[in-house]
Amino acid sequence: MVLRTLFLVPLYSRNKSDWGEEMETYIVSFEINKPYEDWLTHFEQSRPGLDAADIAVLFRGPRKDDASKVCVILKANEGEVDKFMEANASMIAESGHVLESTVVDVYKS
């Protein structure tokens, strides 16, 4: 049996009422086909676009036992992450993110 425990620490403390919409937390896991450090460089270069879309990055990191598997946790207004990922699919793929491996879990605040 595999037991997974996830503790989310509020690293981003914007008040929901400041955003004016329902907030969503995205837990995105996927595989990469480049070294993690290369993927991370691409990801960090995308930060201005994420910031412009009011998407907060709460966490990003490789799986402890397999650096080709990555998890990113994001918080944003409803639908904003979907819009960002659709608009930037080619840039995301260039980073080494294997798009067809993506698993997204969305939680409401």
What are these regions (language model features)?
Residues 2-91, 97, 102-109:
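Short S/T/G/P-rich N-terminal loop/turn motif that feeds into the first structured element of a domain
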